[in-house]
């Protein structure tokens, strides 16, 4: 990652919006403590899994010098698993309003360096998924042309089927999850020592 002309290796974690047993209404001092502990262990980057974070969280990331991947959706049009009451029910009606709200709220945070359109959405392997990814990426780029767009992909081991490759090509940064699932394709895409 290039930051102010310097190459920076991102060493990060995924953080959900809650603080475990403290729940979702997290006191700012709890986030400050958690972020300080992460910084002490060498962490400099955070992915906000899988929903937009609280503004106070991003304020702390700005102050403490973290790089943030700001993520919005955990589900698009296709539902995950057997759950029948997820965001997929509302996606077509609400995606644009929700996305614009997040971008407009978060785009002035210097800590936000990457936008993430989603987490392991089933849409990545269906023909219609590329069109959804295109709409999301275009909206991100229109509202904020300064940051790259990604999506957490977990179906890489499925191969370059008719749906996955066009889906991946719409992302500025292709994020790969679960390297251990890739089997013989692992070395094509990933190496701990590769820069």
Tell me what each language-model feature is.
Residues 1-40, 59:
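N-terminal carbohydrate-binding accessory modules
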Residues 32-41, 45-195:
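Substrate-binding/catalytic cleft of secreted carbohydrate-active enzymes
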């Amino acid at each position: 990652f290039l930051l102010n002309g310097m190459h920076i290796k991102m060493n990060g974690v995924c953080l959900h919006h809650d603080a475990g047993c403290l729940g979702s209404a997290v006191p700012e001092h709890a986030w400050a403590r958690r972020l300080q502990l992460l910084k002490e262990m060498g962490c400099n980057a955070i992915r906000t899994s899988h929903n937009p974070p609280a503004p106070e969280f991003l304020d702390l990331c700005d102050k403490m010098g973290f790089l943030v991947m700001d993520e919005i959706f955990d589900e698009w049009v296709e539902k995950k698993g057997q759950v029948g009451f997820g965001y997929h029910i509302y996606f077509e009606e609400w995606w644009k309003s929700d996305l614009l709200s997040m971008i407009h709220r978060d785009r002035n945070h210097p800590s936000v360096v990457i936008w993430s359109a989603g987490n392991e959405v089933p849409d990545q392997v269906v023909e219609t998924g590329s069109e959804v990814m295109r709409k999301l990426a275009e909206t991100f780029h229109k509202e904020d042309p300064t940051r790259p767009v990604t999506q957490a992909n977990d179906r890489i081991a499925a191969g370059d089927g008719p749906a996955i490759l066009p889906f991946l090509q719409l992302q500025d940064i292709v994020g790969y999850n679960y390297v251990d699932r890739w089997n013989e394709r692992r070395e094509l895409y990933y190496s701990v020592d590769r820069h």
